[in-house]
Amino acid sequence: MKSQILKLQQTLTKKPASINPLLQQIDGAINEHWSSNFLLKNTVEWAQAQAPKNRSKSPLNNIPFVLKDNIATKGIVTTGGSRFLEDYIPPFSATVFELLNNSGALLVGKANLDEFGLGGTGLHSGFGFVHHPWNETLIPGGSSSGSAYAVARGIVPFSIGTDTGDSVRRPASICNIVGFKPTYGLISRNGVYPYAPSLDHVGIFARYVYDVALVSDEIIKHDKADFSAQKSPDAGKFTRSLKESFNKQIKIGYLKPLEEWFDIELSKKWNSLKERITLEGCELIPFHFPLELLEVIDPVYKLISYSEAVSCYSNLTGIVFGQKLFEPNQASDFSKTITANRDRFFGEQLKRRFIIGAFGTDKNNFTKYFEKAQKIRRVMVDAYLNLFKEADFIVSPSASGFTKTIAAVQKGESFTNLVDDFLQLANFAGNPSITIPWLVKQKDQTIGLSVNANCFHDKQLLQVAAWLEELFQIEHDD
């Protein structure tokens, strides 16, 4: 089973002194790719100071990684991709960063993202676009754009992102890597800037499923500091499970209505997949999931997530912390001061989404819109999770087509449909979901395969993903 982490660890074990040349090499790669805007902060110097102190027995010891810049790092600027927090240095670290730090992993950079995670293209950071790793005219997907870029270009063997609607799995699909979102609450969100707390997940990028399992063993741990934390029945056993024999006598479901949205090329690849896994001994189950539910996934997602977001960031006033146009004692009007600060330092996309969220939670609209959206979400989740009573896993393309150009997205051309929206169901339900490389037309035109399991079946999901990964045999360019 392929693993970049183990390969690198073997080199470091044989030649401990090779850590310094490795970090210098990464520093050079970061500088070479700096114009792609995938990083907001180069922390290689921090890693160089940390490496000699590491004594961990973890497979991640002295393994470099990149962290999405909405995850707090004590003493290191954490912007959330927003000009509002351009100079903000957290006095604490997120639990997920502390766990990685304790494992000996070395932070070499803070990754760019759509502002506070509210975006799916990589074009809405306060610090400029993130470009596709293999074609600067294309979008990389978002919001965890920089984290995906770093892994796709081989700069680091793994990175950490966040996934509220598909923000790990969509860029993984576009960048031809693995993106894993575990069951809700298994990776602590303590110290992670929120977008929509009922939907937010921390996720992992890597080139191979085995590396995702290695990282999962280190960061899927119950955290009392996270009120939404849940305990995994398989914590610490994910890597070990991939070495066990895999029973291919499984039931794999798919949503039949989505096939109508496939283009010719995607349909051909999809039919080939169904034939292959049937030949391998799996049972395929077509589900006629209600079309009326699929059609409202995206509006329900937007209403709930934007409403939660506007509440989460109500503390960004510029009065206590964050950027400000002038000092509070110079302000003549409190409300006007906050409005001026937000207008100046928030991006246009963020402001539009906050307006929608404020509208949905207004006292005159709450019952009509937000409360109704929550009820529809419940109906969706019940219908979706019921599928796992008949199937062990549910598969789907991770996108309806290849990624689009930056120019096309800026023009507002529609480029998603129900196939793309399907990924959001795993955030509504909180079940584990993974994207693995699958359809490769050329290195800048790829579509991943989404594999989903029932809640707390993360171990089984990684097992089937590793098996499918071996079937597909996708090669990576450095």
From Swiss-Prot:
Heterotrimer of A, B and C subunits. It catalyses: L-glutamyl-tRNA(Gln) + L-glutamine + ATP + H2O = L-glutaminyl-tRNA(Gln) + L-glutamate + ADP + phosphate + H(+). GO terms for cellular component: glutamyl-tRNA(Gln) amidotransferase complex. This is Glutamyl-tRNA(Gln) amidotransferase subunit A. It is an enzyme of class 6 (ligase). Keywords: ATP-binding, Ligase, Nucleotide-binding, Protein biosynthesis. Its EC number is 6.3.5.7. It comes from the Bacteria. GO terms for biological process: translation. The gene is gatA. Allows the formation of correctly charged Gln-tRNA(Gln) through the transamidation of misacylated Glu-tRNA(Gln) in organisms which lack glutaminyl-tRNA synthetase. The reaction takes place in the presence of glutamine and ATP through an activated gamma-phospho-Glu-tRNA(Gln). The keyword ATP-binding applies. The active site is at 68 (charge relay system), 143 (charge relay system), 167 (acyl-ester intermediate).
